[in-house]
Each structure stands twice: as C-alpha cells, then as structure tokens.
UniProtKB/Swiss-Prot annotation:
Subunit and interaction comment: NDH-1 can be composed of about 15 different subunits; different subcomplexes with different compositions have been identified which probably have different functions.
Family (UniProt): Belongs to the complex I 49 kDa subunit family.
A GO CC annotation given for this chain: plasma membrane-derived thylakoid membrane
Main subcellular localisation: membrane
Domain of life: Bacteria
Gene label: ndhH
Enzyme Commission number(s) of this protein: 7.1.1.-
Keyword field: Membrane, NAD, NADP, Plastoquinone, Quinone, Thylakoid, Translocase, Transport
Record's protein name: NAD(P)H-quinone oxidoreductase subunit H
Membrane protein topology class: Peripheral membrane protein
Coiled coil: none
Length: 394
C-alpha cells in the first residue's frame, strides 16, 4: 500500500503591531511550515521619535526629562546614563550622598522593571494570577518615587549633572526599609506559585536556548547574557556609582533557555533588596549635588575686580558646555547594557548623541532562536527577552 504524500507550502502570517503579546508596537512577519516556524522578520520603527536628534538640539540639562520615554519601564536608568556621560567627559565629581541615593533609585527601578516583565511574561504562558500581584508591589515603588521625585512611573526628572534634583524627604528612608521588609516574602510567594509549578516548568524549559558563544557573538547583555553562562554585570565590571561599597553577588545560569532567564531575574530582585538595605544603612551625610559649578567658561578660578574668587553656584548651570572630546558611558539596566556615545565640541549641545539600547540589541537574536520552534512558543520566547518598544525604536 503506497504512502500518501502531502505537500505543504509555507504560510506567511503577520503578528502585530497591535497584538497584546507583542509588548508594544512590534510587527513580526512569521513564515510557518504547519506549526513550525521557518523564519521570522521583526519590523520595528513604529515608535521612533528621533530621540538622538532631539538630544543634539538640547542642552544636557534640558534633555533629562525626555529620556524617560526611551524605556518607559526603567526611566531612572535612562536618566543615570544621560547625566553620567557629561559627568565623565567633563570630570565632574558626584558627592557620596548623591551616589548612594542614585544607587537606591536604580535598584528600585530594577525591581520595578523585573516585576513589569514578570507579570506579562507569565500571562503570555497562561498564568494570570501573578499578573495582578506584581502591580501591587510596583505601586509601592511608585509611591516611594512620588514622595522623592514628585512623579510616579516616567518623567521622574530626578538625576542631575553632579548629583540629584532634591534630597530624600523626611521619613522616606523608613518607608523604603518597610518596602524591603514587605517585598522579600512576596518574592518567596512568587517562587512558590511559579518556580516550582510543574506546568510552568514544562511550558518554558528548553525554549529559546542561547549558548554561551551565541550570547557573546550577538552582543547580548543583562539577564539574557547571564542566563547563558556568562557572569558579566557592569556594576561589577565598570565600578560606576558606589556599587563597590556593597556586598552583593552576580546571579547567572548555564542553560540559556526561558526558564534560566526567569530564574536570573527573580534572583536579581532579591539581590536588589540586599543592595538597597546596605545603601540605606550606610547613607552618608553631606550635599546631594555638586555645589561647585566649576565647569563654566571662566574656568575653576577667575579674577574679578582684582580679587581671586571661586564661583559657587547651586547647580551646574543650564549653559554648561560639553568639553571637546568623545566618550562612551554604559550602565547595567534591568534589560542589560544601556550606553551613550557622546561627542562634545565645546558647545552647550552635544555634536553626537548615540543611544545603545539593551533590548534593541537583545531583540536581534530573536529570529535566530525562533527557527524550528513551534508557533505556540513564539510568544513565550519573545516575552523572555524583555523588550520595550520605546527603547527599541527610540
């Protein structure tokens, strides 16, 4: 009896840009052979707003409120790297207290970023309950931000060249400690609900595997890189801010699949609480911003009416000129390495302001790891990458 031969042709389908699982306005042109994915072409740019060109027509002080719109789930990281670039280019010192406050804010943002990743990712694979839990904890972080900066989710506009915009208000430190005490048991609750759930583990284990060599060759960073067996964290590597003052570990996994990326992020939330507690305990006194506006055109010291004087101002002036030179600054955001390549030419505007977004680079490997996967696994693999289209498109 002869076997019946069936011949199928590849089918091309569009996912997005208006799709609840695309995590923004991302369009995927997916080529399928039955249930198997043959090819996938991401189409980006729907949220492009010309952020780099805007930066080149604004002073650094004027541009800080804009940057929260890149990765609108991690505005503090955007602000930090934006002010770090001219600080390092112009050799501006940041007071110790301001550096500690920055670390506290950055680690709160890392927790908020991972929470906002966790809820939709679990909803993508069919677990709805934790989706509502994560917003409960994020609201507490937003309350802390509102008390310190006046705003909740984006546009905190808190970081300044040489420090931060305002000191922590009375009682804020106690509220932050209360949040840390409250949040750690909640992470244990997530683990009980999710990590040890056999249905969840079977659903994502072995999906979207990225080897150590692939992760390095594709330029991945953040949890995507650490989940593939590379123990690389810019907080340890570049020694920026005051992370060297604290005792903390870099968490990593070897399997490189969706489950490994989940485990890295869960453990990073615990580690962020550990860093915040140490920063609060050792929070020094002193100014919260650099009180010497010593990078004005006159230089560090000038003569005026035959007197030597040191110009003291409350803040770095809005007309602060970026010295001639070029510099690349990077920090470890919740998604990976976010960097700024800045070129100054003794003007108040940067000559070039290049943004290196972590999720834009991490998204490049998506078609590669999707080949041969089932179409039902597409959304789970995409969710494990953690992208925000405002940051991808800029």
């Amino acid at each position: 009896m002869s076997q019946i031969q069936t011949r199928t042709e590849p089918m091309v389908i569009n996912m997005g840009p208006h799709h609840p699982s695309m995590h923004g306005v991302l369009r995927l042109i997916v080529t399928l052979d039955g249930e198997d994915v043959i090819d996938c072409e991401p189409v980006i740019g729907y949220l492009h707003r010309g952020m780099e060109k805007i930066a080149e027509n604004r002073t650094n002080t004027m541009f800080v409120p804009y940057v929260s719109r890149w990765d609108y789930a991690a505005g503090m990281f955007n602000e930090a790297v934006t002010v770090n670039a001219p600080e390092q280019l112009a050799d501006i010192a940041v007071p110790k207290r301001a550096s500690y406050i920055r670390v506290i804010m950055l680690e709160l943002n890392r927790i908020a970023n991972h929470l906002l990743w966790l809820g939709p990712f679990l909803a993508d694979v069919g677990a709805q309950t934790p989706f509502f839990y994560i917003f409960r904890e994020r609201e507490m972080i937003y309350d802390l931000w509102e008390a310190a900066t006046g705003y909740r989710m984006v546009n905190n506009n808190y970081f300044r060249i040489g420090g931060v915009a305002a000191d922590l208000p009375y009682g804020w430190v106690d509220k932050c400690e209360d949040f840390c005490d409250y949040f750690l048991p909640k992470v244990d609750e997530y683990e009980r609900l999710i990590t040890n759930n056999p249905i969840f583990r079977r659903r994502i284990m072995g999906l979207g595997v990225i080897s150590r060599e692939e992760a390095i060759n594709w330029g991945l960073s953040g949890p995507m890189l650490r989940a593939s067996g590379v123990k690389w964290d810019l907080r340890k590597v570049d020694h920026y801010e005051c992370y060297d003052d604290f005792d903390w570990e870099v968490h990593w996994e070897k399997d490189g699949d969706c489950l490994a990326r989940y485990l890295v992020r869960i453990r990073e939330m615990r580690e962020s609480v550990n860093i915040i507690r140490q920063a609060i305990k050792g929070l020094p006194g002193g100014p919260y911003e650099n009180l010497e506006a010593k990078r004005m055109a006159e230089g560090p010291k000038s003569e005026w009416n035959d007197f030597d004087y040191q110009f003291l101002g409350k803040k770095i002036p809005p007309t602060f000129k970026i010295p001639k030179g070029e510099h690349y600054v990077r920090i470890e955001s919740g998604k990976g390495e976010i960097g700024i390549y800045i070129i100054g030419d003794n003007n108040i505007f940067p000559w070039r302001f290049k943004i290196r977004a972590a999720d834009f680079v991490n998204l490049q490997i998506f078609p590669h790891i999707l080949q041969g996967a089932k179409v039902a696994d597409l959304v789970a693999i995409l969710g494990s990458i953690d992208i925000i289209m405002g940051s991808v498109d800029r």
